[in-house]
């Protein structure tokens, strides 16, 4: 919220967030941020340093005409290193982010050295993977998180079948197994992860985005309306917890994009060819995204509508 108050562009937001965590620290676990303005969209992933002050992070600009997604699992893997790529900088030169429009990667200066100093990574700098070092994907990270990204990608681009076994957590390929507490090398990284972004077959609309939010894995073998848990009325809702055990066998409910415990969801629309007062719209909906009605909330609003205020 502080960043929203202080920033007018995605680049300013990244700089503000980086400076805030550097000055005041960051105690929370990892988080992924979609940061957009009318001209650019960035994805930034950030995780605290435990007992040390600050955070390690990476921010990448999503290329024009591409789409990306994240769902509670870090997704940035390797990234271009400063010094070897003129469009990449570290936090030491973060002021350049505002001055040079060609910069499309910026990261904490110690994102790799911190991992090495804390026995998290023992490989070459050029093969360092943010997600695989700081938030290694496991079964639940794939089945409950990555599968939601897969569901969206699968609706906009061909060829996503090749990532199905990965997204379901059935087959996370590694040359060598990941061992918690042991410094990783690139051989411990999955070799079949989904790309961070894909180029859609056609332009994605606001209505498409709303439809993605309503997904229950329909049309796949994990379609929540079709399995035994759906009952005779093909209900996509499942009680929590997501996992349980019977007679020594573990089972899981699917974690689709739309769930019954959602408090609110929204689709943010930035329109560069409209006056700024009404160019930004938050299509806001309360409760379950599958059945919500998305209502336009303009960025020029100074008061919350009574029906939402109550």
Where are the language model's segments positioned?
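Surface-exposed ligand-recognition segments of extracellular binding domains, strongest
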Residues: 59
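A short, sequence-level motif marking secondary-structure junctions
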Residues: 46-52
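C-terminus-biased signal that marks the final domain/tail of proteins
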Residues: 14, 18, 29, 38-41, ...
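A conserved hydrophobic secondary-structure block that centers on an alpha-helix together
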Residues: 3-32, 38
């Amino acid at each position: 919220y502080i960043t929203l108050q202080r920033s007018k562009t995605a680049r300013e937001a990244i700089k503000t967030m980086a400076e805030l965590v550097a000055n005041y620290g960051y105690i929370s676990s990892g988080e992924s941020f979609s940061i957009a303005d009318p001209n650019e969209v960035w994805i930034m992933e950030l995780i605290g340093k435990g007992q040390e002050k600050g955070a390690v992070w990476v921010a990448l600009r999503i290329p024009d005409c591409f789409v990306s997604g994240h769902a509670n699992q870090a997704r940035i893997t390797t990234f271009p290193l400063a010094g070897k790529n003129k469009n990449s900088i570290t936090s030491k030169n973060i002021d350049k982010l505002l001055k040079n429009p060609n910069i499309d990667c910026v990261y904490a200066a110690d994102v790799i050295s911190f991992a090495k100093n804390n026995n998290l990574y023992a490989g070459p700098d050029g093969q360092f993977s943010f997600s695989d070092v700081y938030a290694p994907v496991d079964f639940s990270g794939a089945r409950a998180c990555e599968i939601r990204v897969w569901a969206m990608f699968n609706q906009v681009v061909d060829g996503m079948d090749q990532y199905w076994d990965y997204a379901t957590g059935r087959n996370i390929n590694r040359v060598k197994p990941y061992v918690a507490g042991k410094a990783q090398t690139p051989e411990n990284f999955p070799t079949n992860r989904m790309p961070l972004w894909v180029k859609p077959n056609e332009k994605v609309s606001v209505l498409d985005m709303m439809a993605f939010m309503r997904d229950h894995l329909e049309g796949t073998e994990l379609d929540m309306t079709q399995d035994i848990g759906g009952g005779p009325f093909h209900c996509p809702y499942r009680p929590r917890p997501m996992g349980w055990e019977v007679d020594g066998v573990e089972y899981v409910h699917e974690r689709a994009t739309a769930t019954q415990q959602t408090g609110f969801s929204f689709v943010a629309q930035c329109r560069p060819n409209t006056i700024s007062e009404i160019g930004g719209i938050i299509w806001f909906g309360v409760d379950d995204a599958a059945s919500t009605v998305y209502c336009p909330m303009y960025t020029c609003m100074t008061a919350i509508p009574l029906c939402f205020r109550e």
